[in-house]
UniProtKB/Swiss-Prot annotation:
CDD domains, alphabetized: RNase_HI_prokaryote_like (cd09278)
Residue ranges of domain RNase H type-1 in the record: 1-141
Primary localization class, coarse: cytoplasm
Reaction(s) the record says it catalyses: Endonucleolytic cleavage to 5'-phosphomonoester
Family: Belongs to the RNase H family.
Subunit structure: Monomer.
Species the sequence originates in: Chelativorans sp. (strain BNC1)
InterPro entries: RNase_H, RNaseH-like_sf, RNaseH_domain, RNaseH_sf, RNaseHI
Lineage: Bacteria, Pseudomonadati, Pseudomonadota, Alphaproteobacteria, Hyphomicrobiales
Entry's EC annotation: 3.1.26.4
Requisite cofactors: Mg(2+)
Manner of cofactor binding, per the entry note: Binds 1 Mg(2+) ion per subunit. May bind a second metal ion at a regulatory site, or after substrate binding.
Name the record gives this protein: Ribonuclease H
Length: 162
């Protein structure tokens, strides 16, 4: 089984507001960069989307070391998700899980891989995290307001680049 390193990040301007996600996939010295964005989203949604897109980009089952600066992502996938599934996608206090459709997509995306989740401190000089952040900002850029108040966006309000 191939061993892949993935570094992900999400960014949002306004939270909610325009946002982007970025991911670096590294295998055997080769890197692939992915990024995309949405017109109206949150930072947490972009963090989840980065991980989903990165895992879905893998063409075969892999052993993955996924690095994120998001405690929300790491804690959710490493601990909370099993309880949410048992509770019908409700929290311990019976409220609907926020971003449930993304958590479900992430749960599905990770199934064919053996994923090790790693937390890194964001904006602390970690080179791959800084690059993933730059990719997330690039994904967000088309949706940020331009001078004159217009918002640049695609027809669907989201964009992905691979």
């Amino acid at each position: 089984m191939k061993r892949i390193e993935i570094f992900t990040d999400g960014a949002c301007s306004g939270n909610p507001g325009p946002g982007g996600w970025g991911a670096i996939l590294r295998y055997n010295g080769t890197e692939k960069e992915l990024y995309g964005g949405e017109a109206d989203t949150t930072n947490n949604r972009m963090e989840l989307t980065a991980a989903i897109e990165a895992l879905e980009a893998l063409k075969e089952p892999c052993e993955v070391d996924l690095h994120t600066d998001s405690n929300y992502l790491r804690d959710g996938i490493s601990g909370w998700i099993e309880g949410w599934k048992r509770n019908g996608w409700r929290t311990a206090d019976r409220k609907p899980v926020k971003n449930a459709e993304l958590w479900q997509a992430l749960d599905e995306a990770r199934r064919r891989h053996k994923v090790h989740w790693h937390w890194v401190r964001g904006h602390a000089g970690h080179p791959e995290n800084e690059r993933a952040d730059a990719l997330a900002r690039a994904g967000m850029a088309p949706f940020k307001k331009k001078k004159g108040g217009d918002t640049a966006s695609s027809e669907e309000g989201s964009a992905r680049r691979r």
